[in-house]
Design a protein with these regions (language model features):
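Conserved Class I S-adenosyl-L-methionine-dependent methyltransferase catalytic core
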Residues: 3-24, 29-30, 35, 44, ...
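Alpha-helical subdomain
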Residues: 1-67, 156, 161, 165-329
């Protein structure tokens, strides 16, 4: 590492903001499958022609567009991930990250005080915020392929019932149902979130097949009698005591021999690796009471709750998570 590394690190936000603005302005959908000049793009976008040319050139330099004979085209990457019509569209996640820009301005204060820069309400206070957050999670998992991969990989032999806690858009239950239609699947989540979940399930055409249960896992009892309880990206949003209590609740809700499956960033004992997890912990500092936890911490919560046969498995890239499983006696 040298000066260039530090220089790039300090200025990395510039590329992020260019991408955020391009998605906000709908540049990729506007260009679509045809080449477009700066003049035509500015006319369709209702933007300044000079400024439009500058951002189109920047997006080309960032390998998000191609430029030939003064016309701009989408490339394979932007066609797959930045067109709203693509099944792998990632734009929802980019919009959400853009909406967090002002939150990051509060980082120094958050470190001084130890308090989040944003009220940790899981984006439930404002309906638009709820939809932005939940659909961002849907776009992330769909674009990266997590749900499809796990639905194929997880051993569901002998499983008759599954509960997804904090499912958000329901992306994982949808994939599991399509792979294992004989399993009775339930989702337990906050009422504001379930309004968005219903839309996703209706779009997938399987709304009646998945049961939606409204509740707060920190305050309410969990429904009972499941062979598998799944929770993805939940523990990083909670503090140690809340996670320990949640494992106790999950143990009580499982059938004998049932399994808990946790998918999350799982850190090494130094809490510095993987890099994405250490950085994501700062995100959690800004917006929740949580952080990313080490395997030794998760293992202890599970053991204290009574789980046995605890295992972990790192998922392949581009997924950045680990699966931790435990079995009820």
């Amino acid at each position: 590492m040298d000066f260039t590394y530090l220089d790039n690190l300090s200025g990395a936000y510039a590329e992020s903001r260019i991408l955020h603005a391009a998605v906000e302005l709908n540049i990729f959908d506007t260009i679509g499958d045809k080449g477009m000049s700066t003049e035509d793009a500015a006319a369709k976008l209702h933007t300044d022609e000079r400024a439009t040319g500058l951002i189109l050139n920047a997006l080309t330099a960032m390998n998000l567009l191609k430029k030939e004979d003064n016309l701009f085209y989408l490339n394979d990457l932007s066609k797959k991930y930045l067109l709203s019509t693509s099944e792998a569209c990632y734009a929802g996640m980019i919009r959400f990250e853009s909406s967090m820009w002002n939150v990051w301005e509060g980082l120094s204060k958050a470190i001084r005080t130890g308090k989040p820069a944003r009220i940790p309400d899981m984006y439930q206070t404002n309906r638009d915020d709820t939809e932005c957050f939940i659909m961002a999670m849907h776009h992330l998992v769909s674009a990266r392929g997590d749900a499809t991969y796990l639905a194929e990989k997880l051993n569901m032999e002998g499983v008759n019932s599954l509960l997804d806690i904090g499912s958000g858009p329901g992306t994982y239950p949808v994939a599991i149902y399509k792979r294992h239609p004989g399993i009775s699947i339930s989702i337990f989540d906050l009422p504001g979130t379930l309004d968005i979940t219903r839309k996703v399930l209706e779009k997938e055409g399987i709304r009646p097949r998945i049961k939606l249960i409204s509740g707060d896992y920190n305050k309410d009892s969990l429904p009972q009698g499941f062979d598998v309880i799944f929770l993805s990206n939940i523990i990083h949003g909670e503090d140690e005591d809340a996670n320990s209590n949640l494992m106790q609740k999950i143990y009580s809700s499982l059938n004998p021999g049932g399994r808990v499956i946790i998918k999350d960033h799982i850190m090494d004992e130094s809490l510095t690796k993987p890099t994405c997890g250490a950085i994501f912990s700062i995100y959690m500092l800004l917006t929740t009471k949580g952080r990313d936890y080490g395997y030794h911490e998760v293992q202890k919560w599970l053991e204290d709750a009574g789980f046995i046969d605890i295992t972990r498995e790192d998922l392949p890239q581009p997924m950045s998570s680990t699966i931790v499983c435990g079995k009820k006696v």
